[in-house]
From Swiss-Prot:
It holds the Pfam family NTP_transf_3. GO terms for cellular component: cytoplasm; membrane. It is found in: Cytoplasm. This is Bifunctional protein GlmU. Binds 1 Mg(2+) ion per subunit. GO terms for molecular function: glucosamine-1-phosphate N-acetyltransferase activity; magnesium ion binding; UDP-N-acetylglucosamine diphosphorylase activity. Acetyl-CoA binds at A379, N385, Y386, S404, A422, R439. InterPro entries: Bifunctional_GlmU, GlmU-like, GlmU_C_LbH, Hexapep, MobA-like_NTP_Trfase, Nucleotide-diphossugar_trans, Trimer_LpxA-like_sf. The lineage of its organism: Bacteria, Pseudomonadati, Pseudomonadota, Betaproteobacteria, Neisseriales. Residues 229-249 are annotated as: Linker.
Length: 456
């Protein structure tokens, strides 16, 4: 039997009633990624012959959310873990081994699974744990010589068996040559009226197949999620591990306990991240980048020596070197900033290319625009890019000076070194080196008296 023929089955059909959520349990996220997706990615790292995911409750939602290359099998009736694996049998090889994983055990890692597979060889591998509180979990039964002989679920366990602290994590390696016969012989004659996958241990022993137990090196690696408290506990463990890895790699985290990584972070040297920062998706930070407190950075690239001030939100954007962003700035998708750009408080940029050295320091909206270098936006400048049906583009040249409280009504083009007077509404193109004013002339009313309230 070729030991390198590996099939994986991921059980993800449960309702998750204790989550009190309309979302299928396995779609709840750890580190910004659905739990079942994490398990699929871990399984894929083992290079198996196939990955079979058994779904049931919320099947359509799971399939719509998780875009991974796998065989998806529906368990129409939730009749237990043994029945779930049985539904996957038509997709498993007749030779080799099957690794059984769970869509709600998100932190299982490749190292643990490789150790289990090596220990199992061509026999049965069983991942066990000795948690602080084994209540509610299946107990490992051993004979006088210490060999595993069975697993007893707590609802079926005797008072003596309940004192056993070693528990079954549910993760198994099973020989395919025996698997079908074992599954077909399962009985639902138990406290829950279900077909237990754990009953295969006793069947293996009866057939003379050795059960090779491997104790997980840390309980959280095999911990399942049944409620929001457990989800939060694993999330915090995951985030702590991510923070520790970043610290080892030279990133300065002002408070590792107040940092969330919900994706992947690529970074240079001397990166500093302040408290309550959230990193999502694919993020790249260059050398000497500083991220201020309470920022959210999602799918963004930030060049060397740039500083992001507190409470800024960057998503789907590219920031050049030596930029100064924020506080309270928002860069939306397709915002692309060259080097030495300043974006100040309450400035929003969307789908716009901003040239080198340009500044928008206060209260400005720049959308669907192409802006040259060394241009300055006065406070309160608005690019009116939407006519109610379509978005239109604005082109602004180099060294343009836009006065405070101006509105640029797209589509419109401002040439190089144009100046607009404060309070102007610009609706027509302006040639290079021109001053444009588009506002009512001030009138002072002589002899005017301010109305006063009647004192009676």
């Amino acid at each position: 039997m070729p030991q390198n023929t590996l099939n994986t089955v991921i059980l993800a059909a449960g309702k998750g009633t204790r989550m009190y959520s309309q979302m299928p349990k396995v779609l709840h996220c750890i580190g910004g990624k659905p739990m079942v997706e994490r398990v699929i990615d871990t399984a894929a790292a083992l290079n198996p012959q196939n990955i079979c995911v058994v779904v049931g409750h919320g099947k359509e939602q799971v399939l719509d959310t998780v875009k991974r290359d796998a065989v998806w099998v529906e368990q129409t009736e939730q009749l237990g873990t043994g029945h779930a694996v049985k539904t996957a049998l038509p997709h498993l090889a007749s030779e080799g081994r099957t690794l059984v994983l769970y869509g709600d055990v998100p932190l299982i890692d490749v190292e643990t699974l490789e150790t289990l597979l090596e220990a199992a060889g061509n026999e049965v591998g069983l991942l066990t744990d000795v948690p602080a509180d084994p209540a509610g979990l299946g107990r490992i039964i051993r004979d006088g010589s210490g060999s595993v002989t069975a697993i007893v679920e707590e609802k079926d366990a005797s008072a003596t068996q309940k004192t056993i602290r070693e528990i079954n994590t549910g993760i198994l390696v099973l020989p395919n040559a025996k698997l079908e016969n074992w599954l077909n012989s399962l009985s639902s004659n138990n406290a829950q009226g279900e077909y237990y996958l754990t009953d295969l241990i006793a069947k293996a022993v009866a057939d003379g197949i050795k059960v090779r137990p491997v104790r997980v090196r840390a309980s959280h690696l095999a911990a399942g999620v049944n409620n929001k408290r457990q989800l939060a506990e694993l999330e915090r463990i995951f985030q702590t591990e991510q923070a520790q890895e970043l610290l080892k790699a030279g990133v300065t985290l002002r408070d590792p306990a107040r940092f969330d990584l919900r994706g992947r972070l690529k970074h240079g040297q001397d990166v500093v991240i302040d408290v309550n920062v959230v990193i999502e998706g694919e993020v790249e930070l260059g050398d000497n980048v500083e991220i201020g407190a309470n920022c959210v950075i999602k799918n963004a690239k930030i060049g060397a020596n740039s500083k992001i001030a507190p409470f800024s939100h960057l998503e789907g954007c590219e920031v050049g070197e030596n930029n100064r962003i924020g506080p309270y700035a928002r860069l939306r998708p397709q915002a692309k900033l060259a080097d030495n750009v300043h974006v100040g408080n309450f400035v929003e940029i969307k789908n716009a290319a901003i040239g080198k050295g340009t500044k928008a320091n206060h209260l400005t909206y720049i959308g669907d625009a192409e802006v040259g270098s060394k241009t300055n936006f006065g406070a309160g400048t608005i690019i009116a890019n939407y006519d109610g049906v379509h978005k239109h583009k604005t082109v602004i040249g180099d060294e343009v000076r836009i006065g405070s409280n101006c509105v640029l009504v797209a589509p419109v083009t401002l040439g190089n070194k144009v100046t607009t007077g404060a309070g102007s509404t610009i609706t027509r193109n302006i040639e290079d080196n021109k001053l444009a004013l588009a506002r009512a002339r001030q009138t002072v009313i002589e002899g005017w008296m301010r109305p006063e309230k009647d004192k009676q």
